[in-house]
């Protein structure tokens, strides 16, 4: 998979020639992090209580699927088959920058998810007080 020049430039700020890709346990997409950002997340995951089932499940899903991938000189990464299969990736993918990470979606999956988000609107069942100060 080729990374757009803009993303390559952003990852270059971290002085990393590789990234970590793992699954998103909440949706059928992949999460791609610079190595240095993933190290922070993994440290937090490692501190979760090992006797809590939900914590162990999250560790198994995120850390268990975390894969270090080199970015080649052409700005490409080779996603392993299990990650591609999880996210239902085919030839067309969508990359969504999300701050310090990038979501990798199969184009068809993203189109469906985006339509669901739009149909649900901002009046979904979850209310976040922290969003009340955001103006678009």
Predicted regions and their residues:
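Extended intrinsically disordered, low-complexity coil regions enriched in Ser, Thr, Gly, Ala
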Residues: 12-18, 24, 86-102
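Acidic/histidine-enriched, glycine/proline-rich intrinsically disordered or flexible terminal extensions
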Residues: 117-136
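Short, structured motif recognition centered on aromatic/hydrophobic residues
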Residues: 1-3, 32, 75-79, 83, ...
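A positional/architectural concept
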Residues: 1-29
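Helix-adjacent hinge/juxtasegments
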Residues: 31, 35-69
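Beta-rich strand-turn-strand
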Residues: 67-76, 81-90
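C-terminal end-helix/capping segment
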Residues: 96-123
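Short, basic amphipathic alpha-helical segments that act as recognition/interaction helices
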Residues: 26-38, 101-110
């Amino acid at each position: 998979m080729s990374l757009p020049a803009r993303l390559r430039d952003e990852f270059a700020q971290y002085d990393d020639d590789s990234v970590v890709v793992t699954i998103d346990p909440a949706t059928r997409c992949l999460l791609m992090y610079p190595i240095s950002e993933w190290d922070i997340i993994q440290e937090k995951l490692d501190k979760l209580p090992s006797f809590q089932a939900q914590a162990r499940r999250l560790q198994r899903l995120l850390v268990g699927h975390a894969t270090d991938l080199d970015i080649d000189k052409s700005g490409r990464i080779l996603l392993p088959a299990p990650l591609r299969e999880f996210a239902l990736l085919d030839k067309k993918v969508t990359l969504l920058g999300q701050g310090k990470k990038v979501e990798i979606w199969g184009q068809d999956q993203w189109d469906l998810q985006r339509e669901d988000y739009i149909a649900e609107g901002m009046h979904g069942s979850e209310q976040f007080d922290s969003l009340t100060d955001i103006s678009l």
